């Protein structure tokens, strides 16, 4: 209670500023203006409604046009803002009054009433002063409202009435005329444009486009005009159409001719281009062509191929050797010459005895049985291998006490002696007769000076030669060569009869009408092969005059060159009489051909082979010595053909046997339980160290490029085991992985050996790592590591 009494005493005793302050001149003006404006708006709306009803719109429009103001009137906008601010302040004041507490004192309420009454008195005085201004503003507001309404309605459109056309006149059609954009209008000075560089650039581009479009438009219009003129022309007659057709035909022919010429020109160019692309070499350019092909070879083809190339090499060697060396004499030939000297002495003594006893012999016994036989292949081979023991085959029923010796003459030796020793001027009769030797073993030799026997022998030989010539053309060639190279048979002395026949032949008797020519035909097949090797070949004949088996001893005192040719003839005879057949399956082999020729098809020049192969400087540098050659020249390679070892008698056989020892291990036919055992010896060397220098494989890296960690050493992996795929870092880790993979060891099953009782001797044999499994996995423990202190055994 004391507080309320104190407040009342303060209110009565104190004086407030609001009571003592003088009143403002414009107090309450804003609220009054708002009220008046609201009244004016209501009145204006009523007038507009009445005016619309009465139809006074035209007059009001004319008044509005007279008092039309600009839309951007800054003064009016400022006044409108002030009015809005006053309205907002009034609303704020009314809201503040409502929020005041109802328990205000009666004195404060009385003061407020006094303040409001004073404001009303001041406002009445000010209204009289501003009456004229308010009237002006009211009129302005009215004019603006009218103008806004007119704008909202839009302008009034008045349509013009069209004159009605008369009944007789035609109604003209209306054509819409479009104004074409002209490029020149863009460059007019009166046109308002910007002076910016970008704007000027764009205008120039538009100007160019419009100018081009205008040119095209003119061209199109000109075409349309011509087309319309053509349509408007009169119809053509038949003569005019024929004339136009002829003209068009000429034009078409010319165009077709031109088209043909173009096609021919294109074809020629295309062919020339293809030819230029194909022709990679210049004319007369040396080309070395390599060709590898598949080839089916048989053993016979291999032998023929080897024989052909052997002959080619022999020909080349003969061309290279200007002065061929004579081959060395064999010791066997020397011994044979010594034996021949002894035989020659015995023959001379026998001949002397035969001259004395020949008169008392009966020559008619010679004519009892006469026969000419051709020796078989086995007899000829034996006669060639052992000429001192050549025995003629005669039946025992035909033997008689009188006998004549077997006469054998070596024609090839005589023929080659004429080539090697006898000059062209020397007669060949003496050479032939000196080489012929007649011997007898165990029987006396009679003198053959009777003319009848000699004529019969010559006729037999001539008939046999004729049959051989008629048998085959190859034999005719050989016989002609023999006849040209050897002289006709003649007597060198009064006592000796000389007959020219082939080697290893026996004269047995008169010729029969039918002669066997098997051996001759066999010899004729080998004639081309022997001509390739540049050796003379003669056919074999054997003639005998005896009834008893005789032995013909051949004395060949010849030079070493003759003996070599004789050996070649013997080998060829062996080949012809007993040919060895080689059989075998065909083998697919590869054959490489190297061809050197001049482009396009000129034959190669074999003389300048090295020049074509190594260049033009080859001949120049080849003629110079090693000191005169330029320093920048280097030897590329040495081409040397190894010479095969030359044997005295070339063997026709070739060893083609294969090593089939590997087939012994396989089971043969009928063996089902045989097993192949491979023996593998392994040696362990612990002193060597493994040094890995290869690059790490891709399996060492993860997907992000980081190396994997080694499971043993926890280092970065360098390699991984290809068998298991386990990565490792070094060799020690790899060894540990190998030990873990070893499942069996000598000491694995022994439980009596404790961990501490292991020694160094058996440490290698024991298991170092042992697997200890758990519920969800396990671990390999190193048994060699000592556990920590206090760990129980077996933990």
Curated annotation (Swiss-Prot):
Regions annotated as coiled coil: 28-63, 121-150, 204-281
Cellular compartment(s): Nucleus
Keyword Phosphoprotein: yes
Biased composition (Polar residues): 468-496, 568-585
InterPro entries: Vps72/YL1_C, YL1_N
Feature: compositional bias, Basic residues: 316-329
Annotated spans, Disordered: 40-179, 314-406, 462-510, 554-585
Biased composition (Acidic residues): 57-92, 119-133
Entry's Gene Ontology molecular function annotations: histone binding
GO CC term, one of those recorded: cytoplasm
UniProt similarity note: Belongs to the VPS72/YL1 family.
Comment field (misc): Present with 358 molecules/cell in log phase SD medium.
Protein name: Vacuolar protein sorting-associated protein 72
Phylogenetic placement of the source organism: Eukaryota, Fungi, Dikarya, Ascomycota, Saccharomycotina
Gene this protein is translated from: VPS72
């Amino acid at each position: 209670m004391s507080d309320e009494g104190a407040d009342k005493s303060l209110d009565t005793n104190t004086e407030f500023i609001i009571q003592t302050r003088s009143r403002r001149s414009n107090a309450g003006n804003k609220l009054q203006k708002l009220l008046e404006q609201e009244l004016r708006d209501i009145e204006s709306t009523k007038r507009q409604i009445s005016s619309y009803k009465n139809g006074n719109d035209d007059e009001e429009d004319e008044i509005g046009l007279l008092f039309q103001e600009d839309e951007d009137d800054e003064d009016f906008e400022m006044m409108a803002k002030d009015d809005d601010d006053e309205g907002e302040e009034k609303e704020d004041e009314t809201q503040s009054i409502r929020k005041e507490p109802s328990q205000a004192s009666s004195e404060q309420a009385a003061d407020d009433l006094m303040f409001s009454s004073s404001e009303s008195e001041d406002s009445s005085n000010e209204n009289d002063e501003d009456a004229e201004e308010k009237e002006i503003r009211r009129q302005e507001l009215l004019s603006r409202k009218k103008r806004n309404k007119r704008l909202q309605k839009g302008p009034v459109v008045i349509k013009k009435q069209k004159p009605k056309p008369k009944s007789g006149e035609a109604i003209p059609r209306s054509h819409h005329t479009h104004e074409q954009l002209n490029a020149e209008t863009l460059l007019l000075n009166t046109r308002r444009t910007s002076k910016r560089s970008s704007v000027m650039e764009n205008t120039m581009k538009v100007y160019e486009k419009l100018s081009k479009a205008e040119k095209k438009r003119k061209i199109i219009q000109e075409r349309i005009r011509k087309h319309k003129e053509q349509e408007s022309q009169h119809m053509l007659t038949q003569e005019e159409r024929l004339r136009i057709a002829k003209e068009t035909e000429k034009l078409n022919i010319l165009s077709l001719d031109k088209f043909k010429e173009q096609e021919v020109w294109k074809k020629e160019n295309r062919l020339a281009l293809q030819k230029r692309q194909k022709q990679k070499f210049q004319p007369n350019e040396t080309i070395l062509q390599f060709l590898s092909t598949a080839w089916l070879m048989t053993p016979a083809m291999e032998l023929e191929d080897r024989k052909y190339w052997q002959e080619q090499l022999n020909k080349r060697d003969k061309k290279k050797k200007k002065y061929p060396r004579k081959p060395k004499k064999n010791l066997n030939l020397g011994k044979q010459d010594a034996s021949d000297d002894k035989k020659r002495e015995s023959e001379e003594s026998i001949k002397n005895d035969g001259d004395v006893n020949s008169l008392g012999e009966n020559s008619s016994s010679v004519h009892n049985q006469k026969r000419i036989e051709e020796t078989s292949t086995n007899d000829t081979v034996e006669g060639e291998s052992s000429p001192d023991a050549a025995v003629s085959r005669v039946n025992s029923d035909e033997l008689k006490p009188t006998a004549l010796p077997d006469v054998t003459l070596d024609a090839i030796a005589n023929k080659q002696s004429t080539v090697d020793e006898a000059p062209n001027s020397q007669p060949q009769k003496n050479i032939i007769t000196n080489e012929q030797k007649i011997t007898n073993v165990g029987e006396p030799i009679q003198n053959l000076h009777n003319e009848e026997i000699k004529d019969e022998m010559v006729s037999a030989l001539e008939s046999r030669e004729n049959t051989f010539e008629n048998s085959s053309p190859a034999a005719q060639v050989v016989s002609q060569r023999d006849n040209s190279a050897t002289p006709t048979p003649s007597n060198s002395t009064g006592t000796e009869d000389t007959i020219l026949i082939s080697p290893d032949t026996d004269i047995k008797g008169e010729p029969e009408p039918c002669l066997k020519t098997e051996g001759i035909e066999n010899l004729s097949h080998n004639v081309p092969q022997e001509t390739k090797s540049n050796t003379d070949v003669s056919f074999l004949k054997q003639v005998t005059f005896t009834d008893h088996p005789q032995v013909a001893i051949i004395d060949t005192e010849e030079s070493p060159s003759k003996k070599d040719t004789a050996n070649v003839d013997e080998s060829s005879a062996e080949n012809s009489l007993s040919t060895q057949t080689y059989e075998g399956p065909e083998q697919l082999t590869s054959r490489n051909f190297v061809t050197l020729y001049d482009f396009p098809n000129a034959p190669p020049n074999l003389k300048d082979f090295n020049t074509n192969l190594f260049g033009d400087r080859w001949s120049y540098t080849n003629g110079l010595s090693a000191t005169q050659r330029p320093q920048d020249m280097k030897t590329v390679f040495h081409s040397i053909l190894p010479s095969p070892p030359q044997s005295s008698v070339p063997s026709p056989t070739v060893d083609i046997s294969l090593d089939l020892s590997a087939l012994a291990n396989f089971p043969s036919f009928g063996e089902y339980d045989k097993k192949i055992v491979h023996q593998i010896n392994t040696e362990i060397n612990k002193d060597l160290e493994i040094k890995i220098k290869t690059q790490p494989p891709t399996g060492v890296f993860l997907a992000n490029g980081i190396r994997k960690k080694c499971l043993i050493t926890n280092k970065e992996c360098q390699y991984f085991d290809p068998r298991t795929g386990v990565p490792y870092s070094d060799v020690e880790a790899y060894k540990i992985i190998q030990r873990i993979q070893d499942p069996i060891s000598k000491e694995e099953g022994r439980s009596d050996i404790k961990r501490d009782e292991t020694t160094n001797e058996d440490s290698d044999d024991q298991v170092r790592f042992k697997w200890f499994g758990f519920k969800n996995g396990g671990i390999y423990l190193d048994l060699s590591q000592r556990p920590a202190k206090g760990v129980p055994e077996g933990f």
